[in-house]
Structures are given as C-alpha cells and as structure tokens.
C-alpha cells in the first residue's frame, strides 16, 4: 500500500543531507566534467520528495545505468517502485540495498524494511516478508510496531502456524490499544479480537481430535 505518512517521515531524514547527495552519489569524474548529471540527480531527488515517483525513477534508472548508484539510491529506487505498486522490482532493489545500508539512521532504515516487507507480502512471499517486518519492529517508533505485528500474524496464519499467528496478533492488539491515534487502530482492534479467538480455536483442534 502507499503510505504517505512513512514517506514524509523518511523525507525528514533526507532534508539534512539532500544538498550533499548529488555530489557524493556520482564518481569524481562526473562531478567535475558532467555537471548536467549531478543536476539530473538533484532533479530525481526533487521528484522523489514531491511524490512524483515515476518521474524520479526515469532519472535514477538512467543515472544508474551510466554510473551504478550507491546502495542508498538503490533503496530510493526500491521505494519508488513500492509506491508505484511494482512490488517485484521493489523487492529486487530493496533486497539488494538493505544489507549495505546498516549505517543509516534507524528510522530511515525502518521505512526501507517496511516497504520491502510489504512488497514481499503483496507478492504472497510470506516467509520472505517476516524478517523485514521483524527488522522494522526493532528500529521503528512504538506507534508503528502494530502494523508489522499485524502483518506477521497473517504471514503465519497463511502458513497455518496458529501459535505464532496468535502471538503476533496479540502483540498487534496490544500496540494498537496503546496507540489509538493510529489511523487503522479502531477497526483492527475489533478484527484482531476475532482473529485471536480463531487462532485459539485452531490450536484446540488437535487436542480435541485426541479425545474422539
């Protein structure tokens, strides 16, 4: 899903270094002799910060073919694909970039983790999604944790791992209850109570069958 709230949070981290990024993203030769390309990179960032992800991707892709941009810019490209609902390409870029950007600020990384997890989830690659949701939980703000626990619960539920599903649904319920300001909290609290009960019933089925 598109999540403008997360995008805006990420942009707060970008603004500090935004003016330096075009300089350090390209080779020294490009910085000296191809100023139009540094301008192109700056324009790609402008498009990105304005939510014009398709236009941003066109410029990033052209520059990447010529110079091979660094991992952080590949992560930007992954986010662009995510916001364009192209989850396969989002996974391709984010899977490659994430191991190389561990030195970045925690909350910036949390947005890459969540976007990658959501991309795998939407591709029904639930086992692949879980580790990225878990990484997101480790570094995100408390009011953002519920969404990842909620998704992890579904990942396990789709694999019929009822105990793990129930545990994560319970964690999601706890965080949504603690943070009612989250947009989806009210509807998900009601849903989660039903989901938890359903998981508990599934956990009882093998025990009940022993007494038949």
Role assignments for model-derived ranges:
Residues 36-62:
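Alpha-helical segment of the N-proximal tetratricopeptide repeat
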Residues 76, 115, 151, 185-188, ...:
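Canonical tetratricopeptide repeat
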Residues 174-212:
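Terminal, low-structured helical/coil segments at or just beyond the last alpha-helical repeat
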